[in-house]
Regions:
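C-terminal segment of classical bacterial N-terminal signal peptides
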Residues: 17-26
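Acidic-residue sensor for enzyme active/binding pockets
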Residues: 33, 41, 53, 57, ...
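A general secondary-structure boundary signal
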Residues: 37-41, 47-61, 65, 114-116, ...
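Bacterial N-terminal signal peptides that target proteins for export
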Residues: 2-13
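N-terminal periplasmic/intermembrane-space "pro-region" immediately following the signal or transit peptide
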Residues: 26-116, 123-128, 248-251, 469
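Outer membrane beta-barrel
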Residues: 96-306, 380-410, 415-420, 444
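Outer-membrane beta-barrel pore domains
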Residues: 134, 172-174, 185-189, 200, ...
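Low-complexity, intrinsically disordered short segments enriched for Gly/Pro and polybasic residues
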Residues: 10, 24-25, 74, 78, ...
Length: 469
């Protein structure tokens, strides 16, 4: 029954009762005609008043009923009665929001990722030794496209699983990219002084290598970092900050890392032999505070690495260690067994808008005879450095950066490669949305000493758009 019908019925009942209660006394009384008329007038006035109150209540209920449907929640529905099509507005049902819930018992779960797109023009990647027989063409490049998830458990475990759509691990041809894992690890952190990390991640060697891709001041890492550092490996490490609880104000004073890894690269579950790669790193932050009212710090670091590898192992993950006949560089896949030892030192000083970063790396690659089989290559020593500086011309928005780098592969006489890079970074929304542009000039000592192979100086421009989510 509608509201209108319900209240009309109530009004009729009230009128009837009022008439009965009014007429009966009038019939029984012997009062004058004027008294009877006065009583009737009062009864009519009372009925009119009650009728007005009931109408007001009906109107109030109607307005509430209409207001219960939110604005903009109507949709047009077309019906057919057999003769014509009729359009009418009907209330649109509210949709239940869609959400994702973890299947496990994680107390924290975060989904994120980032995309880096490059435009590369000129002598593309010449600073990495890609010229001559390994030269690349001008290109647009999806440099990285990663998606990952991190989480925490109440039982003092945290984890990360991340993959990249732009890697070429095992793809054919090698220029083809595919999706593969980057960081896949589990970390036990009950004691900040002694945490255990297990899985695939960057072995703790090299400051520039360990700096996140999204926070680098220069678009690409230096040639030295690519040639010597082991990048991502599968293994386990013990790491921590010894002063976290005993000296909380100086918890970052010292950080240590010590790990054991397969040593033959990422996304490879089989070890190349029964030996492992041993990696260690120490970081010291003797100062963290303010200088001239500016947030500042000084961080010092040192690394060491040792690995015994078998034939077929790629000891240069970035593909820029083996010196070709024309002085260009490519991946160094061992023709025989080796033992390699590397070390490095680094420093990072920040004073407000100014950063100064320096790093030196050195690696000894010595052949091993296994089961009477010679290594098939001569021993060599590779070394190099990078010095990087940045300054915010507009605080937190517009930054100028410069880098000087050098790599001595050490396999042919006078085979060093130098590069100087100048760049500008525009932080539209911090590192979440950033534009970068670099100009790189490169010299090849080998090409200069052997002009028959062609040019010995190279130029490149790289632009990048970065989005994090």
């Amino acid at each position: 029954m509608s509201i209108r019908k319900c209240f009309l019925w109530q009004i009729s009942c009230v009128v009837s009762i009022q008439l009965i209660t009014t007429v009966q006394p009038l019939a029984a009384q012997t009062a004058s005609e004027s008294e009877r008329l006065q009583k009737l007038e009062r009864a009519v006035e009372l009925l009119q008043k009650q009728n007005a109150e009931l109408k007001a209540e009906v109107n109030s209920l109607k307005s509430k009923e209409t207001a219960s449907v939110p604005d903009g929640k109507f949709k047009t529905k077309v019906t057919y009665d057999g003769k014509t099509y009729v359009e009418k507005a009907v209330v649109e049902e509210k949709k239940v929001p869609v959400y994702v819930q973890q299947a496990g018992s994680e107390i924290k779960l975060v989904l994120g990722g980032f995309i880096q797109t490059n435009f590369e023009d000129g002598n593309v990647s010449a600073f990495e030794g890609r010229f001559g027989q390994t030269a690349l063409k001008d290109r647009f490049r999806l440099r990285r496209a990663r998606i990952g998830m991190t989480g925490d458990f109440a039982q003092n475990f945290d984890f990360k699983i991340e993959g990249d759509f732009e890697q070429n691990d095992g793809t054919s041809p090698s220029s083809r990219v595919d999706f593969s894992g980057t960081d896949i690890w589990l970390n036990w952190h009950q004691f900040p002084e002694a945490q255990i990390k297990l899985g695939q991640y960057k072995a703790p060697f090299g400051l520039e290598q360990l700096t996140p891709d999204t926070t680098l001041l220069i678009i690409e890492r230096s040639n030295t970092t690519g040639a010597i550092t082991p990048d991502r490996q599968i293994g386990v490490e013990l790491w921590g900050k010894p002063f976290t609880n005993i000296w909380p104000e100086q918890k970052d004073l010292l950080t240590y890392y010590g790990g054991i890894f397969n040593g033959n690269g990422r996304n490879i579950n089989n070890n190349d032999n029964n030996n492992f790669m041993y990696v260690g790193r120490l970081e010291l932050m003797p100062f963290k505070g303010k200088i001239f009212g500016q947030e500042s710090f000084l961080k010092l670091g040192g690394d060491v690495l040792n690995s015994r590898d078998d034939a077929g192992t790629n000891i240069s993950q970035s593909g820029n260690l083996l010196v070709n006949s024309d002085g260009s560089l490519s991946s160094f896949v061992l023709p025989g067994a080796d033992e390699r030892t590397a070390w490095g030192v680094d420093a990072w000083f920040e004073l407000g808008p100014f950063d100064l970063i320096g790093e030196y790396l050195e690696e000894y690659v010595n052949g091993r005879t296994v089961n009477g089989v010679p290594p098939g290559f001569a021993n060599f020593t590779t070394d190099g450095f990078q010095i990087t500086s940045g300054y915010f011309l507009i605080p937190k928005k517009f930054q100028a950066a410069v880098q000087w780098q050098y790599l001595n592969p050490g396999q042919k006489g006078n085979d060093g490669i130098y590069s100087i890079t100048g760049g500008l970074n525009y932080y539209i929304h911090g590192n979440d949305l950033k534009l970068m542009i670099n100009y790189i000039h490169t010299w090849s000592d080998f090409r200069q000493a052997n002009p028959e192979f062609g040019q010995d100086e190279f130029n490149e421009v790289i632009g990048r758009v970065q989005v994090m989510f």
